[in-house]
Amino acid sequence: MSDIENYIGNTPLVLIDQIGSNKIYGKLEGNNPAGSIKDRPAIKMIKDAEKDGLIKKGDTLIEATSGNTGIALAMAASIRGFKMKLIMPETASIERVKTMKAYGAEVILVTKEEDMELSLIHI
């Protein structure tokens, strides 16, 4: 396990408010390494697929995405030793694309005329 994996899900629980004797707490999921709650399912999916023998280090993972799941998958794939291809709409923000690429993912942008899921057949 890489050091960064220790931080996925280990986010602070903070008191937000108290109404009478009831306390309201919130989890600061933005403190996950890739910045969202999506880090949890991303690392779990990859680790479960590894454990079940469906994927092995060095394989290329492919996902159609438009946001935080793609960023989390790019991070998780990188730290677990996988290549990652992410298919996104061309309208995706440049910040998202750059973040995914920073984790080593290949980002394939598709036009609105193309269907993201159908574009998987061209890879």
Which residues does each predicted region cover?
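PLP-dependent amino-acid enzyme catalytic core
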Residues: 1-121
